[in-house]
């Protein structure tokens, strides 16, 4: 078996050839091709101009072409232009650095229109005498299913299954990151703690399905009123938090009031009975050392609102304590 194939399978970084064309004149290559056909990966060779000189049958099947028609074609012939940046950038990196490149490529093949993700390993092919990079050999593996599974697991680990908001773990992690940014950039940071009034009575009187409906409505309400650089999550039960970056406490209070009013106006029951919530609002203080400081104050403001008659919002003041 030719040295270049041995090196490619072992993943060695450098391949030296006198001429790429000799690969295809060698009668032994039919045996090598049998091995390439059974690898279950996409194998291809390109010259310095990005023109294909070889592709194994799996790659040809993806491109819906044959070995003869492939010759001289480039990635522009097989992938949509807006998907080529990752592919071409990796090729160029191989040509310029003379080093192997391992990266992920997200591409849509023109043949089937499907978005697939590939883990591509690209090795430079060097001229035996001059050491000039005269092409590359690539081995790509379709990892779409793995990436999708990874994303699903990430969602499961970070998302509340009922409301589809951040769960407690993800919420605290994002809150800590926002806290650090606010301290570093000396920007305001506000927190709204929200709790549905008498939620246990709703579950007891109307059932947990109705309670779930109320929670999901509130989650969608949050998503409809907060901007992209804010985030929210479910702390647990009927308690939620909204974190507003680069936002002063007065602006946060107005947002809390907007949420409270829209929630109170929604008729959850045929009897036209309404459900209410309370919110406590606080902001970053100069001496705060952790998100627990902000959260504690918003929680105190929340329970002051509940003590004062429910269905209201309260900003933390020193007198709140």
Swiss-Prot record:
Keywords of the record: GTP-binding, Magnesium, Metal-binding, Nucleotide-binding, Transferase
Residues annotated as catalytic: 238 (proton acceptor)
EC number(s) on file: 2.7.7.65
Outcome when changing residue 237 to R: 3-fold decrease in biofilm formation. 60% decrease in diguanylate cyclase activity. Does not affect the overall structure
Disulfide bond among keywords: no
Residues engaged in binding Mg(2+): 195-196, 238
Residue ranges of domain PAC in the record: 102-155
Reaction(s) catalysed (UniProt annotation): 2 GTP = 3',3'-c-di-GMP + 2 diphosphate
Cofactor remark: Binds 1 Mg(2+) ion per monomer.
Alphabetized PROSITE patterns for the sequence: GGDEF, PAC, PAS
Keyword Magnesium carried by entry: yes
CDD domains with a match to the protein in the record: GGDEF (cd01949), PAS (cd00130)
Effect of residue 238 to K: 2-fold decrease in biofilm formation. 50% decrease in diguanylate cyclase activity. Does not affect the overall structure
Domain annotation GGDEF: ranges: 187-318
Domain writeup: The disordered N-terminal region is not required for diguanylate cyclase activity.
Name of protein: Diguanylate cyclase
Native source species: Vibrio cholerae serotype O1 (strain ATCC 39541 / Classical Ogawa 395 / O395)
């Amino acid at each position: 078996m030719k040295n270049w194939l041995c090196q490619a399978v072992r993943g060695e970084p450098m391949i030296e050839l006198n001429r790429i064309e000799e690969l295809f004149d060698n009668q032994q290559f039919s045996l090598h091709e049998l091995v390439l056909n059974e690898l279950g990966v996409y194998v291809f060779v390109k010259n310095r101009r990005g023109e294909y000189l070889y592709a194994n049958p799996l790659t040809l099947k993806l491109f819906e072409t044959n070995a003869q028609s492939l010759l001289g074609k480039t990635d522009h012939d097989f992938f949509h232009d807006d998907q080529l940046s990752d592919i071409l950038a990796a090729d160029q990196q191989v040509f310029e650095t003379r080093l192997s490149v391992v990266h992920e490529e997200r591409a849509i093949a023109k043949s089937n229109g499907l978005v697939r993700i590939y883990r591509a390993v690209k090795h430079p092919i060097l001229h035996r005498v001059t050491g000039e990079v005269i092409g590359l050999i690539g081995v790509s593996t379709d990892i779409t299913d793995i990436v999708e599974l990874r994303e699903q697991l990430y969602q499961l680990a970070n998302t509340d299954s009922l409301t589809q908001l951040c769960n407690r773990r993800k919420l605290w992690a994002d809150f800590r990151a926002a806290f650090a940014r606010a301290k570093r950039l000396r920007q305001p940071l506000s927190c709204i703690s929200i709790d549905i009034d008498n939620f246990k009575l709703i579950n007891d009187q109307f059932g947990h399905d109705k309670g779930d409906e109320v929670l999901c409505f509130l989650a969608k309400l949050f998503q409809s009123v907060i901007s992209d650089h804010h985030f929210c999550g479910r702390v647990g039960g009927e308690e939620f938090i909204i974190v507003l970056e680069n936002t002063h406490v007065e602006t946060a209070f107005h947002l809390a009031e907007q949420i409270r009013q829209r929630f109170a106006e929604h008729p959850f029951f045929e009897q036209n009975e309404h459900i209410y919530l309370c919110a406590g609002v606080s902001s970053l203080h100069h001496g705060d050392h952790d998100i627990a400081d902000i959260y504690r104050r918003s929680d105190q403001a929340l329970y002051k609102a509940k003590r004062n008659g429910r269905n209201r919002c309260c900003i933390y003041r020193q007198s709140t304590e």
